[in-house]
Amino acid sequence: MLLGCQSQKAVRKPSSNLRKILASNVRAYRKKHGLSQEALADACELHRTYIGSIERCERNVTLSTLEVLAKSLSTTVPELLTGR
């Protein structure tokens, strides 16, 4: 039984709003720390194009990636996922 969802399909379709918030926050924190996409990618051991795709709302990131991003940007996962 799914709580708060009408169907299994609803569970699989992530909110684009959450991706937009994450994209905006990653970009804002990256710029706040004076980091290029490449520098952030290096700190996270990710590819530069992956960071770019997060900032363009093209990726659904894993919890592990969220953790690494938050640590590299000196913030927390909840901060990356909340509107500012």
Give residue ranges: language-model regions.
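Short amphipathic recognition helices of helix-turn-helix/homeodomain-type DNA-binding modules
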Residues: 81-84
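Alpha-helical residues within the helix-turn-helix
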Residues: 31, 42, 71
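Short alpha-helical DNA-recognition segment
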Residues: 34-53
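Alpha-helical DNA-recognition elements
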Residues: 53, 57, 68
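DNA major-groove recognition helix of helix-turn-helix/homeodomain DNA-binding modules
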Residues: 64-79
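Short, conserved catalytic or interaction motifs in soluble domains
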Residues: 56-59, 75
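N-terminal flexible/basic segments that precede or flank functional cores
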Residues: 1-28, 32-33, 38
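Helix-turn-helix DNA-binding elements, focusing on the entry/boundary residues of the two helices
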Residues: 26, 37, 48, 63-66
